[in-house]
Amino acid sequence: MKKSVILNLAGLLIVSFLSCNRENTNVLYRFDNIPDRIWAGEDFWTIPLEDWHIKNGRIECLSDIQQATFSVLPYILKDDDASFRISFDMGLLSKGAHDGSSGVIIGSEALEEKDVRAAVYFGKGIRMGVNTKGYAFLEQQIRQLPAGFDFSHFKIEATGSKISDGYTVGMKVFDVTGKVLAELSLKPENAVTGIIQLVNNLRNASSGNKGPKFWYDNLHIDGPKFTKIEDNSFGPVLWTMHTLSRNILKLTAQFPPVSKSENQNAQFQVKQDGKWQTLATGKMDKDARCITWKLENWDSTVDHEYRVLFDFINSMGNKQIAEYAGIIRRDPVDRPLRLGALTCQFGSGFPYSPVEKNLELLNPDMLYFSGDQIYEQNGGYPIRRTPEDTAIVNYLGKYYMFGWAFGDLMRSLPTICTPDDHDVYHGNLWGEGGINKITPGNLGGFTQTVGFVNVVNRTQCAHLPDPFDPTPIGQGMSVWYTDLNYGKISFAIVTDRIFKTSPDKVASWEGRKDWLKTPLKDPSSIEVPGLELLGKRQEDFLREWIRDWKGVEMKVLLSQTLFTNVATHHGQFDAYLYGDLDSDGWPKSGRDRAIEIMRKGFVFHIAGDQHVPSIVQYGIDNYRDAGWCYVTPAISVGYSRWFRPDELGIPVKNRPAHGLPNTGEYKDAFGNLNYVYAIGNPGNYKVVSNRYQLAQDKSSGFGMVIFDKEQRNITMESYRFLADVSGKEPGNQHPGWPFTINQFDNYGREAAAWLPTLKFNGEADPVVEIINQTTDELECSVRINGNEFNPKVFSKDIFTIRAGYPEKDVWKVIENIKPLNKQNQEELIITF
C-alpha cells in the first residue's frame, strides 16, 4: 500500500511515516477527545462498520452478530521472541438474548499472506477473553470468575514473553481496583505474529447471534515485539476514482462516516510550477460520504500531480490534515490503450492481492470494474435493509473493501465503475425503470429505497462523465449512462439492469420465473411487445453515440453482462439449466435491437457478471453477423457457472481452429445465435482452505484488453487468479486466450452488395457513414483506417455516402450511389 502523509496543524510540519521497527512501542488509545461518530479512526477497522461507534469517550459495539471485530491496523506483532503487553478496559452494555463473550485475538493472520487487509477479515490467532456465563478463557483453557463478577467495568491484559523452553502468552482479568480475578497462560505452537483484534461475541461452537454487547477503552499497546507499519492505516481519505474525457476531469474522493460536528470539506490541489494550488473545494455528501469535483479545460497533454487535503480528528484525538496524493496521467492518444477489465468481487478472495499485484505489473492505462463491487456476504456479516441510514452505512462498510483492495491502483489510473445487481442488494435485478419492488413475489423493481440506490450510484459513478440525459427515472432515481473518450477510444457506458423487464411479465411456469429448466413448447410465449433490455432512452443514446467520432478511432460498449445466454450449468457442477432470464439473452427483441445498433458502429463489447470468462461473437439473423463480446473473469467467484454443451450432446458447428471443447456455433435457449470462440470453465473443484487456491480453481482472475489504434486490432487477455505475469507461464491465461480481432470484425454480416471503393485525397482516417436512401436508415458509421474503404451494404437500394472530419466539421455528401455485385468493381475518389 502507498505511503500516507500527515501534516501537523500546529506548524504545518510534514511528517512522512514509513515502515519502521522501534526499540519499544508504547501507545495508549483513549477516545475522550474524539467526537461521537461511526468511524473509529485511521488506525482501526471495524466489522460491521455500522455496529461500532465512538460514544461517551469510548468504543461501543452495538452488534447482534458473532465475531464483531475492532482491528488495530498499524501495530503488528513481528516474528521474534521479544515481549509485548496489551491491555484495555471493557464493560457490558447489554446482556443480549444469549450468553456470549468478548476479548481479544492476539497475532491474527490470514493463511494466504501477511497482509493486514486479509488479517482483518480472515485472520486467526490466539483467542482470549471473558464469557457472560462467568468464566475467563485463553483458547481452550477456562478459569471461573468470582461469583458476582462485575461485568459493567473490568480490565483485560494480554502478555507475551520468552521463557527458557520457548515462548509464553498470558492473560489476566482485573477488577476496577486492579485486583487480579483470573489468570491463564499457554505456550503457543506457532509464532505469535500479526494484528490484534478486539472482538465482541467471539465465534465458537456454542456461540450464537444476539449475544451481549460491550464497550472498550484505554487500549494500551506496549513492548518491543510490536512494529509500526504506518502504511497499514486507512483513511480518512479512503481512495479516489477519476475519469478524463474531452479535457474534463471528474474525481471522487471517498471518506468514512465522520461526525456531523466534524469538518465536512476537502480541497483538491494540483502541483503547478512546483507549488501546490487549490483548484477546488467541496463538501462531503451527507449520505454517500464522498466529494466529487468537476474541472473543465483540463490540460490532458501532460501528467499532473494532485492531492486531496482533509482536516480531521485522528485516532489519538488530535487535529490533523490528511493528504491523499496521486497522478492524473496524460491522455495516451499516441500509443495503444491498455484496459484492465474486472468484475465480481466475492469477499472470499479479499483483498485479491494476486490480481492487484499482477495488474500493477501489467501497467494498464485505465480500469473498468463492470459490477458487483460488493456481494451481500462480503465482510462475513449480513446486510441490513432498514432503516435507510443504517442500510447505507452497511453498504459503505462492504463497498470500502473494494477501495481498500484496489485504491492504490485507482489513485493514478482513470477508472470506470458501474454498479450491478448485488451492489444494490439484489441477487438478480430487473429494474423496470426504477420502480419500487412492493412484494417479494414481484421480480421487477428495486427492493431498497431510492435514497439507498442513489448513494450506490453516487459512490460508484459520480466521477463518470456527466450522464447523456440526467433526467431521473422512477421514484427520482439517478441515472449514469454516458460516454467517455480516452486514448482515442470512445466508450459507451450503459446499464443492462435498470430498464430491463421482469420475467414475471411472461413466465407461466411453476417455480423460479427467471429459470427455464426445460425448453418451452412455444418460445414465442416469452417474446411479447413492450419488453425492454436497455430501454428506449439508452437505445436512443447509442444511436447518437455510434455517429459521434470526434477525436476517436474505435468504439467500445461497456455493460454489466453479455447480450446472450452462454452458461449451461449454475451453482453446482452438475446443475444443468436450460435458460436463464437473468442473462441478457432475454428479452431477445431488446437484445437484438442493442446488437443491431452496436454493429453499425463496429462496436466491441466488454462485460462481466457471468463468473466464467468467454469470447463470443453475436449473431442476429445468422451466426457471426454482428460484433464480438469479451466477458472477463470474475476477480473472485462465489457462484460458479459453466458452459459445457459438448457433454450435453448439444450440436456444434464450425469449431474454431484451436479445437478446444465447448466452442463453436450454438443456439441458446432464447434462439440467440452465438459463436463461442473461448470459454474459461472451472473444473469440478473441491473446497480447499486456501482462499486464493479456491479462487484459482473456480476460474477467477481478470482481463486485459489492448487497443492497437494503428492497426485497429483488439487483443483480449484472460489471466488466472494466481497467474505470474512477470514470466510467460503457459498456464497464466485461460485456454483460448490471448485472442486478437480487428475493429472491422465487429460487423460480421455478409454483404448483399458493395459500394464503389472509396479513395480519399486528403488527411488519413476520415469518418464514413453509409445511409440507405430508401429507408433513411444508417447502414454503418466508422472512422476508416487510412485513405481507402470498401463499404458493404445489405440490399440493392440506393445509398448516400457522408464522409469527413468531425474535428474540423468538414463533410462531403454524395447521393444516389448504386451498389455493385462485387467488391472493387469501381472506385469513387473523394477530394477534400
Regions found by a protein language model. Give the residues of each.
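Glycine-aromatic-enriched beta-strand/loop faces of beta-sandwich-type recognition domains
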Residues: 105-162, 670-694
